Amino acid sequence: MQISAGNSTTRRPVDQREIPQGTVSKAVKALMDEGLLEDGEKLLRNPDGRTLSPLRLGSLYATAGVKVTHAQEQPGHVTTALFGLDTTRVLGRTDDAADSWDQVADLVYRQVTALKETEDRVRASHGLPPLRMLGVGVEVGAPVYNGQVMPPSHERSKQPVPLAEKLHRLFEADPNVSRPIPVIVENDVNALAVLAIHEIHYTDPDLVVVGVFDEGVGGGLVMDGRLRRGNNGRAMEIGHLAVAFPPGHDLGQNLDGVEAETARPSATDTVYRARCTCGQLGHVDTLATPGRIVEAFGGGILEQISEIDALDVEFKRARETFKRSGAALGRALAHVSNTVNPNRIIMYLSPSLVAAEHQPDTAGAAYLAAVRAETAGAFAASDEPDYLRIRAFPPDPEAVALLGARAAAVCVLESFIEHALRLDGCRPASRRGS
């Protein structure tokens, strides 16, 4: 088995170890007996000419991934998909509206069980056994800690939502569920970071994954090949970095020194007077998000504003809006680069902002040009051309939801791997009893 050799150049200690051939063979046999691994389709040969038996993740198991979309910090829609273990095969999908966290838990439970029942009927018609569930992953656009959806830090009166616990109880009470089903609840940008780890096959040990959403800018930090969580499990709050004021300026005051109002930003605010949802001024979220770009321009549709060209009388104003917004985001990424010094930064953006980079004569092209210029100026930024790697969100909301569901499903697989490697803090006594 090639697994046994180890890789002395890797940053992850678990990858450096040379594992005895017998141990690898026993582990593979146990995983195949359980159905988590199965034989691949055709034999391979290594450079020495030896025949290798390829393995793949087993088709007996499935993982459910759930994306919960939000509207003003309340759940609005739940998308659940059933995936094969490699998360590239979508076995089924369903969507429903939700207006409370209790309803989210009930919906997820019903959606997962319904999708599994449908797939099991298909398998039975082909003489195959029912699926086994590796787990359920839920991605939410909010801070998450130990399976709880946490309230925003500036709203201390609100209580955490024990979403994982609610789902555990629902699955445990189901007489048709013969095995415990693990439930992993994760922040949306952290889930994208875990997805990135798997998509690059652990080749870059230190990553920052950034998501630029309408609601704000978030970041997931990967160090030594593992997702790192901050205080109370929170992701990186890149959107709350102050970038629009010189050091020493009181962020509770406007530029003229008068104490700022507490109202939320509106289209009538001047650019630098827009207030962040946390109540402060000058944050990245007040400048760099698609919604704020539209507000700063004075209204409209982002795609149409982005496509304004030099023949349009609004071109100069539109270009300056995109340039200012992109520079704010790039300045934040520069701070992240100098603080964390990652191998690379992967950033998810609106497809219209990504497409504009390839249309240099349009106003929207100024956005990524400014992002790249500010990021490249960071002291610790790599000079590699793909140090900042841009990925477009899918163009339609349904595809975005499926991406989130897939990322949530990958979080289940990553949790399984970390548990097997004893990296999750689970004590041996509790492991034996699980």
List PLM regions with ranges:
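Phosphate-binding/catalytic loop of phosphoryl-transfer enzymes
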Residues: G135-E139, P143-V284, G291, A407-R432
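ATP-binding/phosphotransfer module of carbohydrate and carboxylate kinases, centering on a glycine-rich
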Residues: M1-R132, E172-N176, H201, P246, ...
